[in-house]
């Protein structure tokens, strides 16, 4: 690639970064100019450090206790002191150990760019302010009489309740940004493969909030399918951001390989998985590394159910991007087209959501796409299984699917086919999907 092309891409990267910030109008917590004050300011028993939840309070007031005792984010820093982290740091020849290296601390702790003095401590891991934003401006007024959630956000509180903002925040570590990213080199040094789906991961964390009437009045309600769909759209846009970023999108003469399907390379030579067609049309040539299309597969399916015209434009844009990756076409132009459509989809879903009338069709499409061969790669199957969990759970809550026990057993059977990514067998996963389909297709018995 010529230096002139790199200069163009540097300008594009800046535009993309600014566009990402504009999506929510809020700076990510680690980039805020406000001062971080430390967890201790939240931990009083009269604030958020109560052993048990309070009755009659607008918040539970035991948030610190739940986080510190049960949430893995609180222990993220401690992982940097274990043997695996020491080995990764040594393999990367880092000048400092993992627990002192910014490349690790940026996602294993709240490591703000604005200097933070004690009592803030990196050892607190992903602390309160790591998600809710540095508290310099909002900590005093947020407890004052008449304080509002909107006012707190204006004072720097990060709006984690809003799916678009939450997706940007979570993906900044669980996928990456131009400033912090788990590269192929870091994975080769021993870091686990990253996987993320916003609705599933949100529910896996111990909730330090209760969605009651007061919560709904202050923050609104977002169903799981909407959160899942927005997360997928933002993930696709984030992937394209990294692909285009001159700092993160390449590593020497190679592209950044974590953006591509891991198992296109990491499988036995005798296991020939290349197919002439994919969900996005004619496949690129054998022997070429494929983009990780797992998020794109999910967004394609979502748009087919919510906006067919936008969905068709997205399919064509991804097909053209894949062709550009193979050397036919301008990759920058085509990647920007995919990002623009993903951003459009995220905003549309945030505004209108997903109709309950489309949910059963969406669940069936998740299954039928797999039966049609769309999940030839592990990452696609993994996302489909998590998506089915979100959609089926919502359908059951709506009374449109019976027997929670059977549904849970069916979902567990799907997950059992995904325990080891290296052992993933597409035909086996298809068989599991085939067994699951009747649970989704069966009409409710009439009373």
What is each residue range found by the language model?
Residues 90-129:
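Post-signal peptide N-terminal segment of secreted/secretory-pathway proteins
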Residues 40-48, 105, 129, 171, ...:
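Cys/His/Pro-rich metal-binding microdomains
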Residues 2-14:
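Bacterial N-terminal signal peptides that target proteins for export
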Residues 27-29, 51-90, 119-127, 134-382:
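Primarily the internal scaffold of c-type cytochrome electron-transfer domains
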Residues 39, 44, 109, 125, ...:
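Aromatic-flanked redox-active Cys/Sec active sites in thiol-based oxidoreductases
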Residues 27-45, 49:
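Short N-terminal segments immediately surrounding and downstream of signal-peptide cleavage
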Residues 369-447:
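A cross-kingdom marker for long, charged
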Residues 19-24:
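N-terminal signal peptide c-region/cleavage motif recognized by signal peptidases
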């Amino acid at each position: 690639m010529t230096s002139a092309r790199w200069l163009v891409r540097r300008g594009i990267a800046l535009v993309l970064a600014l566009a990402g910030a504009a999506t929510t109008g809020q700076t990510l917590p680690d980039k805020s100019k406000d001062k971080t004050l430390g967890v201790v300011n939240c931990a009083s028993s009269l604030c958020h450090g109560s052993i048990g939840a309070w009755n009659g309070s607008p918040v539970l007031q035991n948030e610190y206790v739940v986080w510190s005792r049960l949430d893995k984010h609180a222990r993220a820093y401690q992982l940097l002191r274990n043997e695996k982290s020491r080995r990764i740091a040594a393999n990367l020849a880092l000048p400092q150990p993992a627990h002192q290296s910014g490349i690790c601390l940026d996602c294993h702790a709240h490591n703000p760019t604005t200097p933070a003095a004690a009592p803030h401590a990196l050892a607190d891991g992903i602390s309160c302010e790591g998600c809710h934003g540095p508290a310099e401006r909002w900590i005093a007024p947020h407890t004052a009489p008449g304080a509002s959630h909107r006012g707190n956000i204006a004072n720097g509180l990060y709006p984690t309740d809003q799916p678009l903002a939450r997706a940007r925040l979570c993906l900044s570590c669980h996928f990456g940004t131009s400033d912090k990213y788990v590269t192929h080199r870091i994975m080769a040094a021993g870091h686990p493969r990253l996987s993320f789906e916003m609705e599933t991961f949100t529910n896996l964390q111990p909730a330090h909030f209760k969605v009651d009437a007061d919560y709904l009045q202050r923050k609104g309600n977002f169903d799981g399918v909407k959160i899942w769909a927005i997360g997928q759209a933002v993930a696709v846009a984030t992937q394209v951001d990294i692909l285009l970023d001159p700092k993160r999108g390449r590593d020497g003469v190679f592209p950044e390989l974590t953006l591509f399907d891991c198992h296109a390379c990491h499988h036995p030579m005798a296991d020939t998985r290349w197919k002439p067609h994919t969900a996005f049309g004619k496949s690129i040539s054998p022997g070429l590394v494929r983009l990780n299309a797992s998020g794109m597969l999910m967004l394609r399916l979502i748009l087919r159910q919510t906006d067919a015209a936008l969905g068709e434009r997205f399919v064509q844009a991804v097909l053209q991007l894949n062709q550009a990756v193979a050397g036919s076409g301008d990759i920058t132009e085509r990647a920007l087209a995919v990002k623009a459509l993903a951003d459009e989809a995220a905003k549309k879903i945030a505004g209108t959501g997903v109709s309950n009338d489309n949910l059963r069709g969406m669940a069936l499409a998740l299954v039928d796409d797999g039966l049609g061969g769309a999940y030839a790669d592990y990452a696609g199957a993994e996302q489909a299984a998590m998506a089915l969990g979100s959609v089926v759970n919502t359908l059951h809550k709506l009374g449109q699917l019976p027997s929670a026990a059977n549904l849970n057993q069916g979902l567990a059977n799907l997950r059992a086919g995904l325990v080891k990514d290296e052992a993933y067998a597409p035909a086996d996963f298809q068989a599991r999907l085939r067994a699951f389909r009747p649970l989704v297709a069966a009409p409710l018995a009439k009373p």
